[in-house]
């Protein structure tokens, strides 16, 4: 199997070192509006598109902005989509059921389901905070969605599942499942306190300063491996809409 399926390349960091983000790890992307989160998701999808076409990766997309971001992507790449909270609940139930099926089928046989056995299930979530926060009836739905997503994050990696979630809000109230993401990327944020929420104290102490990223540098990003605490600073290449439509 092509090793490229397991890496997302974002060019080079400020020291000229390659920026290689593991594609098989739950990832949280945090950044203000206009900070360039689309460059991160676009780069991820561009890298994975050949493997989606080969049936080695299966993309599900939740975009609670009515599909305005995901709608730019070649629809042939999307297995299932959800543009509303109610649709997201249905998708998450089906996704969680598939995780259970894989656990039952492969328990005692393998420790990790790999793409040559079953397609990697890539769940991309745009505006993830809107999935976990709600008012009135939506609050009940958001609570259910959070529980389902928690189940997927906890059990999913061994079953060949990767969740990539994007949010503007790093606060725990908005992203209660933040600890479930061992890999973090932060674009422009408002303050050091937001950076510590998004990336953790170790990353900031090791030099990550996303609150200093200029507003006119979209795609500029700090990447943190939460296990090692290592940080890299880079600017993700811009992926235009025409490229997304023709992937």
Residue ranges and their predicted role:
Residues 1-108, 121-125, 129-199, 203-208, ...:
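P-loop NTPase catalytic phosphate-binding loop
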Residues 54, 116-117, 216:
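A generic fold-level signal
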Residues 179-185, 215-247:
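Conserved P-loop NTPase motor module
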């Amino acid at each position: 199997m092509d090793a490229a399926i397991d890496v997302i390349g974002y060019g080079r960091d400020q020291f000229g070192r390659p920026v290689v983000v593991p594609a098989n790890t739950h990832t949280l992307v945090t950044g203000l509006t206009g900070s360039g989160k689309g460059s991160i998701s676009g780069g991820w999808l561009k890298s994975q598109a050949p493997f989606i076409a080969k049936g080695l990766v299966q993309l599900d997309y939740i975009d609670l902005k009515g599909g305005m971001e995901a709608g730019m992507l070649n629809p042939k790449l999307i297995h299932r989509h959800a543009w509303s909270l109610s649709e997201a609940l249905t998708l998450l139930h089906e996704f969680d059921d598939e995780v259970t099926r894989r656990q039952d089928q492969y328990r005692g046989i393998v420790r990790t389901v790999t793409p040559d056995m079953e397609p990697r299930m890539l769940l991309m979530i745009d505006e993830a905070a809107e999935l976990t926060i709600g008012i009135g009836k939506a609050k009940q739905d958001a609570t259910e969605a959070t529980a389902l997503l928690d189940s997927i994050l906890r059990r999913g990696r061994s079953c060949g599942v990767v969740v990539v979630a994007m949010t503007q809000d790093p606060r725990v109230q908005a992203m209660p499942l933040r600890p479930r993401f061992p890999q973090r990327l932060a674009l422009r944020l408002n303050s050091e306190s937001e950076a510590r929420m998004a990336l953790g104290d170790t990353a900031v102490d090791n030099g990550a300063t996303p609150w200093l990223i200029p507003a006119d540098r979209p795609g500029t990003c700090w990447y943190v491996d939460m296990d090692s605490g290592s940080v890299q600073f880079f600017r993700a290449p811009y992926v235009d809409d025409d490229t997304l439509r023709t992937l």
